[in-house]
């Protein structure tokens, strides 16, 4: 058996605080330092301040996101409601009864809360008290941001990072790119050769973090972007990442969770009736949806398939259907 965590861990297990599990599966260590993943500067830039009551809707189960984003909020003297992935009704009730001022989660879930709140007859600007939102884990449009800011009367800013390295970049008030975090050294490289590209050229984000516990040097994230070194009106001198324009590989990201092709193949391989399959990812109304299209002459095990999907793909929701005649699966 090989060494734990690929031999990249430099400390004894007793010096760690936690070890998490991310989709892949990938194991992510956390040492005992404060704000191990380095998100404090991003939350401050987004507008979170001492005295805010913040509802954190990222999962606290196995994956690191919940605690990853709670620690920096505590550094800023914010109180945190560890709501996790609780159902929409409870989330809205908590927001209203506790007069929550900050939201942390995916943009699609905030949109879902807005839609459900309006269905319940809530005036989101008057019945809720949200002032600031920090979102990550998904791409979203400026139209969606503007819509949510108007619905709730709040400021919404985004951050970018991974479970492996933590914070890589974040938006400031001017929202003209992602300031590269102080803890990160970022290169934009050719996806095939790993050779750094010139500023402004689109390539793969490759990051090195100054972490003495878990050595990750020139980690290729699989995301595509570019570097912008033009001065920012906010006064920060760090270069900025442009928009994330795509992925290098065929990995899909659904509601902040990665789904890898080999995970799907492991689930599908159990069902001999399925001849071909295809994953379809859409974002109607700003909310991620995934469909699993299957080709089978006769298939009556949809419930079993979806159950195995939920187990094999870490709870990422999907619906299964057969494609229309003539449509490739």
Task: Give the residues covered by each predicted segment.
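Nucleotide 5′-phosphate-binding alpha/beta core
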Residues: 1-45, 49-50, 193, 286-293, ...
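Short secondary-structure boundary/capping elements
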Residues: 14, 34-38, 61-65, 83-87
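Conserved beta-strand segments that form the floor/walls of ligand-binding pockets within enzyme
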Residues: 21, 55, 134
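Short, conserved acidic/polar surface loops in the N-terminal third of protein domains
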Residues: 31-34, 44-48, 65-68, 93, ...
């Amino acid at each position: 058996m090989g060494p734990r965590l690929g031999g990249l861990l430099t400390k004894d297990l007793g010096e760690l605080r936690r070890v998490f599990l991310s989709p892949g599966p990938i194991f992510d260590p956390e040492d005992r330092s404060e704000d191990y993943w380095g998100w404090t500067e991003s939350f401050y830039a987004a507008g979170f301040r001492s005295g805010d009551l913040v509802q954190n809707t990222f999962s606290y189960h196995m994956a690191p996101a919940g605690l990853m984003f709670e620690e920096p909020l505590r550094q800023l003297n914010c109180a945190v409601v560890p709501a996790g992935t609780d159902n929409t009704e409870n989330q809205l009730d908590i927001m209203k009864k506790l007069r929550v001022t900050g939201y942390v989660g995916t943009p699609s879930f905030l949109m879902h809360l807005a839609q459900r709140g309006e269905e319940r007859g809530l005036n989101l600007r008057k019945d809720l008290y949200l002032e600031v939102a920090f979102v990550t884990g998904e791409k979203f449009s400026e139209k969606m941001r503007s819509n949510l800011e108007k619905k709730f009367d709040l400021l919404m800013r985004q951050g970018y990072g991974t479970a492996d390295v933590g914070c890589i970049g974040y938006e400031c008030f001017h929202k003209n790119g992602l300031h590269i975090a102080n803890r990160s050294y970022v290169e934009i490289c050719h996806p095939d050769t790993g050779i750094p590209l010139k500023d402004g050229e689109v390539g793969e984000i490759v990051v090195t973090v100054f972490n003495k516990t878990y050595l990750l040097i020139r980690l290729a994230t699989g995301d595509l972007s570019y570097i912008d070194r033009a001065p920012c009106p906010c006064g920060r001198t760090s270069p900025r990442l442009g928009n994330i324009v795509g992925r290098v590989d065929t990995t899909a990201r659904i509601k902040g969770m990665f789904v890898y092709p080999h995970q799907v193949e492991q689930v599908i391989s159990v069902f001999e009736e399925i001849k071909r399959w295809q994953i379809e990812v859409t974002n109607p109304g700003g909310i991620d949806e995934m469909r699993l299209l299957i080709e089978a002459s006769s298939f009556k095990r949809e419930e079993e398939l979806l159950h195995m999907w939920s187990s094999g793909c870490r709870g990422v929701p999907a619906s299964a259907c057969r494609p229309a005649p003539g449509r490739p699966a």
